[in-house]
Amino acid sequence: MSIDLHLEQNPTVSDLTDLDAIAQDWQQWFQVWLTHLQKDANYEIALRLTDDDEIQKLNAQYRHQDRPTDVLAFAALEADIPELPPGLAGSENEPIYLGDIVISSNTAVVQAQERGHSHQYELVWLAAHGLLHLLGWDHPDEPSLERMLEQQDILLSLIDIREFTSDTVKPQASEK
């Protein structure tokens, strides 16, 4: 199993996170998560860190909600991944393109402060949430949201995000 992870960052949020410094970590985390969730295929995912303006435009265009949000996931496949037909198993040379995850780094900063953890932890939490959406998870009601949040906790327990140092997460202007 392998993962091709394409990382992008809107230049307006480049002062919030040094994406180049943690790109290898992101690659490893998605590899661990997908190995746990989906063992027998190769995958491709795009992850974009952006600002509230860009995510608000996407949210308005695709979800008809004209406001910023924390994370959007654009699944490339209609089927739930656990039920993929055998022909879509993803060979060594042909990864299955799961889709795009877009995270508002601005909203992640606010939520991290509200929840009492680091900006980086919030980004990883949101990435795990987005990945679950790409794999067919949804939360139309409270019980399904609870199941999804439990799965996010499991995914985060599989990686050691505590290894971050202050040089991989850039301080906010108010923290300088």
Q: Which positions does each model-derived feature cover?
A:
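An acidic/histidine-cluster motif and surrounding catalytic segment
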Residues: 1-124, 135-176
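Conserved ATP-binding N-box helix of the HATPase_c
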Residues: 132
